[in-house]
A protein has these predicted regions:
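Active-site beta-loop-alpha junctions of metal-dependent nucleic acid enzymes
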Residues: 78, 97-119, 125, 135
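Short, polar/flexible loop-turn hinges at active-site or ligand-entry regions and domain interfaces
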Residues: 176-184
Length: 209
């Protein structure tokens, strides 16, 4: 487990701490696979967490509630996936990651980016849907090690994560649908520019209003 976290995600934890976390959440180690894990319905059900947010999308400060989700990106005959984390306090983008694969690594890389930027996250609620990435042992171990509480939308209820759904819709409208994208690298550049504009300019203007 330790070696798998280190190799795949660049995360290093003391083995005793990981053992305590896994015991607390009744987690069992998994083999690293090169394909998408085929979690059983029982495993997913055991790892699903309650909805702590309950559509209360307003907070009193930063790093109280983050929302996260994955959306697909289609341009030409190509497909990619965007994983994003936003802070519900002011809706700024904490971190994002684009990949050709919709896998656990995509979510873990996004989370690690966010944790590199924001160190004071103890007590934070991280809300998502019930996707296999968010019910994975790797995701639960990292969140638990940082004192982050996992919250999940009810199955088949995207409105429970509507701020994230809305943000992805806006990004697609203003990047994916308005440009002649020729490659994944081209699209990543567009997203980088748009997120920088969104965080620095659009949010500032919105908050002034």
């Amino acid at each position: 487990m330790l070696e798998g976290l280190k190799i795949k995600y660049g995360v290093i934890f003391n083995h005793k701490k990981v053992a305590r976390i896994m015991k607390k959440y009744n987690l069992k180690p998994e083999y690293i696979r090169r394909i998408r894990p085929n979690y059983s319905a029982k495993t997913i059900a055991e790892n699903v967490q309650p909805n702590l947010v309950k559509r209360q999308f307003k907070t009193k400060g930063l790093n109280q509630i983050w929302c996260t989700d994955i959306t697909y990106l289609i341009f030409g005959n190509k497909r990619a996936y965007l994983s994003t984390i936003i802070d519900l306090y002011d809706r700024h983008v904490v971190a994002y990651q684009i990949s050709k694969r919709n896998d656990i690594k995509l979510v873990i890389d996004t989370l690690n980016k966010a944790l590199e930027k924001e160190k004071d996250v103890y007590g934070l609620i991280l809300h998502s849907d019930q996707g296999f990435q968010y019910t994975s042992n790797e995701y639960k171990v990292i969140c638990a090690s940082k004192g982050i509480s996992i919250s999940m939308s009810r199955k088949g209820t995207p409105i429970d994560d509507s701020p994230m759904e809305s943000w992805h819709g806006i990004l697609k409208k203003e990047t994916l649908y308005n440009n002649n994208i020729t490659s994944l690298g081209h699209y990543i550049q567009l997203v980088e520019e748009w997120v920088a504009f969104y965080n620095s300019t659009r949010l500032k203007n919105r908050n002034l209003n």
